């Protein structure tokens, strides 16, 4: 996907957005890397809406192979789905990130709990970036020196992934990267 960007939007081996996050002292070196498979265009927006909001769980099958291949290339101790709030989980009936992992025939490990419940999709980029941490570590979990991959459906601003990564890094995680279906 990086090769599709104009040169103005690339800084070395990262996109402008990741570069911008790294320029902020409080977020630098929080997330090691993100892999997104598809461009978040109108088609994918509609497909993901069917998946997340209308319960078309089978759509996860479309992305399972990409996720499995990406994660099999790395030494991973934990594959962590981005958690939903209890309210969102009740609305949808499933966690779309966890479903993506399961459909890839991998084992999700729920290390994080969401402690902030407002919908991210209703917030501006600045509001998302300025949030207090929205995650906490599950009790009695040791991630010290572990390599972790976060899985989410859509990378919009990177805020959700970076908050999750910051929580894991604060607990001693060695390496935290992410995989998203679309960006």
Model regions and ranges:
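Glycine-rich phosphate/pyrophosphate-handling loop used in enzymes and phosphotransfer proteins
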Residues: 1-183
